[in-house]
C-alpha cells in the first residue's frame, strides 16, 4: 500500500538530480557498540535502497559523496576497509545496476587508488556506459575545489583563451549532467563539506538528523516532499514565475 506522501509525490514535480552526503555511518555503529566498519557496511545497504527508490520515483541522476580527499586522514584500518568495500561494490553491485538499465560513473581523482580498484572502475563504467536509466555517480577521492581546479587546468591545456561559466561547467566531473536540484545531508551536520561546490549553486538544501544507515524510502519521500514545497526563483521574483511554479 502506498503512503499518503508517495501518492502526493506521484502527482507533483520530482527532482531530476539528487545529490547526497551519506553521513553518520560511524555514529550509527557507535550507538550500537559496533565497530565503525559495520556502520559502513550498513551504509552500503542504505545506498542500494536509495538507488531503487530514486528509480521508482523517476529521479534521473543520483550523485553520492562516498569518500572525500580529506577522508584519507582517517585511521589506516578504516581507510583500508572502505577501499575494500568500494571494490566489493564495484564487482558485485554493478551487475545489478546493469540489469536495471542504470549507468555508473565514478567522480574524483584516481591517482591514489590501487590497480585493482582502477580496473574495477573502468570495467564498471564500460559495462553500464550505454544504459539509459538512472545515472548513479559516486564521488570517491573527490573534493569540490579539486574539481574546479582540474577543470580549469584542462581548459589551460587545451589552449582556451577565455574561460566562461559554460566552458568551465562542461569540464567539471559532472559536466554531462544537469546541476543537482536537491541536496540531502544525513547525520545532523549542516554544511556541504566541499561537495559539488560549483554545481550546487541553486540546489535546494535539505538536512536531516537521520543517520545514513537509517535513511529509508520514507525519509527520501519526506525530503522530496520538502523540495516540492519550495519556490525555486533563480534570482527572479515570485510574480515572474509561471503560475504552476508559484508557491501559494
Swiss-Prot record:
Pfam families referenced in this protein's UniProt entry, alphabetically: Prenyltransf
Cofactor note: Binds 2 magnesium ions per subunit.
A GO BP entry: polyprenol biosynthetic process
A GO term from the CC aspect: cytosol
EC number: 2.5.1.-
SUPFAM superfamilies: Undecaprenyl diphosphate synthase
Cofactor: Mg(2+)
Binding-site residues for substrate, renumbered to this chain: 24-28, 36, 40, 68-70, 72, 74, 185, 191-193
Active site: residue positions: 23, 71 (proton acceptor)
Keywords, comma-separated and alphabetical: Magnesium, Metal-binding, Transferase
Protein role: Catalyzes the condensation of isopentenyl diphosphate (IPP) with allylic pyrophosphates generating different type of terpenoids.
Protein name: Isoprenyl transferase
Species for this entry: Neisseria meningitidis serogroup B (strain ATCC BAA-335 / MC58)
Amino acid at each position: 500500500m502506498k503512503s499518503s506522501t508517495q501518492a502526493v509525490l506521484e502527482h507533483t514535480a520530482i527532482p531530476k538530480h539528487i545529490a547526497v552526503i551519506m553521513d553518520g555511518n560511524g555514529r550509527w555503529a557507535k550507538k550500537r557498540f559496533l565497530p565503525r566498519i559495520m556502520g559502513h557496511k550498513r551504509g552500503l545497504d542504505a545506498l542500494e535502497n536509495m538507488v531503487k527508490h530514486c528509480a521508482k520515483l523517476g529521479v534521473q541522476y543520483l550523485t553520492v559523496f562516498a569518500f572525500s580527499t580529506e577522508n584519507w586522514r582517517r585511521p589506516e584500518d578504516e581507510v583500508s576497509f572502505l577501499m575494500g568495500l568500494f571494490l566489493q561494490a564495484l564487482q558485485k553491485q554493478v551487475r545489478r545496476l546493469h540489469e536495471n538499465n542504470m549507468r555508473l560513473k565514478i567522480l574524483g581523482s584516481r591517482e591514489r587508488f590501487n590497480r585493482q580498484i582502477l580496473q574495477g572502475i573502468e570495467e564498471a563504467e564500460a559495462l553500464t556506459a550505454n544504459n539509459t536509466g538512472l545515472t548513479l555517480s559516486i564521488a570517491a577521492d573527490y573534493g569540490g575545489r579539486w574539481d574546479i581546479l582540474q577543470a580549469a587546468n584542462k581548459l589551460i591545456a587545451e589552449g582556451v583563451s577565455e574561460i566562461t561559466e559554460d566552458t568551465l561547467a562542461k569540464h567539471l566531473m559532472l559536466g554531462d549532467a544537469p546541476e543537482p536540484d536537491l541536496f540531502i545531508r544525513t547525520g545532523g551536520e549542516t554544511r556541504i563539506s566541499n561537495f559539488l561546490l560549483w554545481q550546487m549553486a541553486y540546489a535546494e538544501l535539505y538536512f536531516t538528523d537521520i543517520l545514513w544507515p537509517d535513511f529509508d524510502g520514507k525519509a527520501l519521500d519526506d525530503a522530496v516532499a520538502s523540495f516540492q514545497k519550495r519556490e525555486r526563483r533563480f534570482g527572479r521574483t515570485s510574480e515572474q514565475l509561471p503560475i504552476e511554479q508559484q508557491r501559494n
